[in-house]
């Protein structure tokens, strides 16, 4: 079990209550530390509008090569990932044969990231067998994508106001971003 969290804001200077974004993402990560006590990491874009946080429980790749957030070899994509891809070795072998990949480590996260870089997000998701939740930042398009497995086994909570967006493996992480949480009844009915 790992923990993921992050946020996007249109006003990068300060978050609610006049806190710095670095302070906020660190607080968000600390609330989910029990999900991944081995290591934590943060990523933010050049404009300081997007922040990704990860709490790591090392299982597949115990080295620092499995650290997250992780950025693709091409530099276009950055990801925080929680879960397991059961068929990652098959996908890794296929990418190695086709593209002669030089892998940094042995994590399923790196395999997912490079698969997305190679075939695109939609095509990559079709190939996956596993349980997972992730946030993927596309640096070229300046877009954030959230994804979960078909059955939603791994938790992923979201908060959105139109100018601010936050997510986390637990609501506690989002509570560090805002004091203004409420349930959207239409989303619950979906």
Task: Please state what every model-predicted region is.
Residues 1-190:
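Cysteine-centered catalytic environments shared across enzyme families
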């Amino acid at each position: 079990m790992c923990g993921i969290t992050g946020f996007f804001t249109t006003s990068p200077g300060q978050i609610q209550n006049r806190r710095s974004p670095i302070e906020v993402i660190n607080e968000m990560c600390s609330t989910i530390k029990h999900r991944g006590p081995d290591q934590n990491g943060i990523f933010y874009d050049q404009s300081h509008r997007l922040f990704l946080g990860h709490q790591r429980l090392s299982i597949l790749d115990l080295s620092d090569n499995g650290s997250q957030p992780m950025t693709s070899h091409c530099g276009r994509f950055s990801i925080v990932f929680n879960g397991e891809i059961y068929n990652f070795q098959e996908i890794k072998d296929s990418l190695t044969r086709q593209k002669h990949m030089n892998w940094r480590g042995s994590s399923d996260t790196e395999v997912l990231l490079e698969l997305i870089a190679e075939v695109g997000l939609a095509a990559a998701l079709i190939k996956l067998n596993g349980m997972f939740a992730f946030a993927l930042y596309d640096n070229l398009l300046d877009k954030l994508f959230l994804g979960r497995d078909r059955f939603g086994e791994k938790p992923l909570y979201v908060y959105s106001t139109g100018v601010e967006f936050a997510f986390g493996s637990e609501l506690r992480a989002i509570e560090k971003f805002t004091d203004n949480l409420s349930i959207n009844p239409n989303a619950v009915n979906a």
